[in-house]
Regions:
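Conserved beta-strand positions in repeat-built beta-propeller and related beta-rich domains
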Residues: 6-9, 40-44, 85-88, 140-143, ...
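Blade-loop segments of beta-propeller domains
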Residues: 20-80
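Beta-rich, blade/repeat-based domains predominating
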Residues: 23-33, 67-78, 114-135, 163-179, ...
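Short loop/turn segments immediately following beta-strands, especially the blade-tip
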Residues: 52-57, 95-105, 152-155, 193-199, ...
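Asp-box/WD-like beta-propeller blade repeats and closely related beta-sheet repeat scaffolds
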Residues: 60-130
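Blade-level signature of beta-propeller repeat domains, shared across WD40, Kelch, NHL, RCC1
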Residues: 270-276, 286-303
Length: 303
């Protein structure tokens, strides 16, 4: 049975059907790949990372600095031995070793960065937005520098991928067919690349709506791409080759994140304070009418 957790800018972490566990602005959650352990990013000026044992509620088992300002994303390596954090405020990414019980151990590895982009307000400096492990390389999307930063698992810097100026890469997803897709928050695009050489294959507006669409999270499932647009409050669906299949209302205001569990897609609508369910059983997302009220939801995690 799937358990749904919701991170937020509100009172704490919601365990659906069980209640709220108080936590400091837990805007992003990640699960250990093999253990009943949950991690949360406390998006504060002095960022914190928290670990919890799951089952019968959440029990905090660890807490440490994120190594930077305003951590907004976490990723756990498939081996379960490393957790990566992206600190949006100062652009520092960090690596944290995990022991056999999934607890923090040793000193964190800090990965600061420098640079800027052409946007006068949003790209004055680096802004790490997401961490993704692909093979034995950590990829960090940097909205502030229009780069995908790359590091070894020991923290050695590799050559970054430089994307279109002003794109503002927010989230990305690798797919088994050797492609990677990136949501451009600042230029409103969804772009596809060859994952080996990062050759651009296609690009498309993430939304057909007029005005600024502020794309947020992007993910892939069953050969389709799903991307949220916070400006028009929509979810867009594309094929792997860039053909748009649908764009539909997200069910609320300012859709920030979504997750798929089986035939259900959950959307965290931050400003309206709801997590809304959509069924994928008919091929394209359709609202089920199921809604969970959460103060400022920012992340949905089915485990």
């Amino acid at each position: 049975m799937t358990q749904l957790y919701v991170g937020s800018y509100g009172d704490g972490i919601l365990t659906a059907g069980e209640g709220i566990t108080p936590a400091p602005s837990p805007s992003f959650l990640a699960a250990h790949p093999a253990l009943p352990v949950l991690y949360a990013a406390g998006e504060l000026g002095e960022g914190v990372l928290l670990s919890y044992a799951t089952g019968g509620g959440l029990s905090e088992t660890g807490r440490r600095t994120s190594g930077g300002d305003s951590p907004c994303h976490l990723a756990v390596h498939p081996s379960g031995t490393l957790l990566a954090a992206a600190n949006y405020g100062d652009g520092v990414a960090s690596l944290h070793h995990l022991d056999a019980d999934g607890r923090f151990t040793g000193e964190p590895i800090l990965l600061p960065h420098q640079g800027s982009g052409p946007h006068p307000d949003r790209q004055r400096g680096p802004h790490a937005h997401q961490c993704v492990f692909h093979g034995d390389v950590l990829h960090v999307s940097d909205l502030g520098t229009d780069e995908i930063r790359r590091y070894t698992l020991t923290g050695d810097a590799l050559e970054p991928v430089r994307l279109a100026p002003g794109m503002g890469p927010r989230h990305l997803v690798f797919t088994p067919d050797g492609r990677v897709y990136v949501a451009g928050e600042l230029d409103g695009t969804l772009r596809a690349y060859d994952a080996d050489g990062w050759r651009e294959l296609w690009q498309a507006p993430a939304s057909a709506a007029a005005g600024v669409n502020f794309p947020a999270h992007v993910d892939a499932a069953d050969g389709r791409l799903y991307i949220l647009n916070r400006g028009p409050n929509t979810l867009s669906v594309f094929t792997a080759d860039g053909d748009k299949l649908a764009e539909l209302p997200s069910g609320g205001d300012w859709p920030r994140h979504f997750a798929i569990a089986g035939d259900t897609l959950w959307i965290a609508n931050q400003n309206s304070g709801t997590v809304d369910a959509f069924t994928l059983a008919g091929g394209l997302p359709a609202p089920t009418g199921e809604t969970i009220a959460v103060k400022s939801p920012a992340c949905v995690l089915p485990v």
